């Protein structure tokens, strides 16, 4: 029943997107444009509106974060990230997960403040406000097709973001309402994300782990557990790492937690030389998506996979080249960067000896 409800929401959200683009086209057709121009201008209007709404959504998080004591660290749209360091903004390109259109990262100064849900609700409040403004615009101007574009776009984004699945705002809000004790894990995850941008070489990954209650549930607790698992890998405690990720896999129903655990179990299989297990994990759709991300850590894993499992030297060199290019710009902390640099050097040595 839960899956049916989820699919129904996805179908409705997609239908609203289609209606938004249709409204945009009809709006320009009513202005007297030919069918072709109306379609082009309508499509462009809807597309630009989408990107503007993405920005407004993240600004909603930033505004509610400001009200509750968050310091702006980064604000991104697509591959572009605006990071605030020492009072100045710096623009850079970054790798993003698929389906992540924009992002806001804030750092909480007072972690005893429990109003994190207000910050997480900022984007949803923006969508509701924009729907009301679009309706008001429609009444005032009678341009209901232009208004309809924004109404349907915001309805679609609101539905997608309220759905308590994966890494949506709705999933995070639902988790913290069900498990308010997970707030401490949420702040740890936010602190980790912020420092990977502010001072990545001033911290180690082990600085962002903490004990997690055995019966803890939810993506924030699981994120801290996966960070602990990665620390085990960095410290060469492979058996402990394997147990940690398998434990997360067994109890989670969060797709992101599951995929990250499978990704690092792939890395462990490569370290242990278990090619069959590595092939099994690498064939998982979510893991494939991560391996396509152009960051140093993902491309080092990709290179080892191509070398040891696929025996594809061309793809191995391609992944290694990307890893070298992205080593300094990838959001890795000091011990992570050192580990993947050494693992890449080890692969280069094996390739040289093989030749």
Q: What do the predicted segments below correspond to?
A:
Residues 44-108:
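Small-residue-rich helix-interface/hinge motifs
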Residues 319-355:
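Terminal, low-structured helical/coil segments at or just beyond the last alpha-helical repeat
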Residues 226-236, 246-310:
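Alpha-helical adaptor scaffolds
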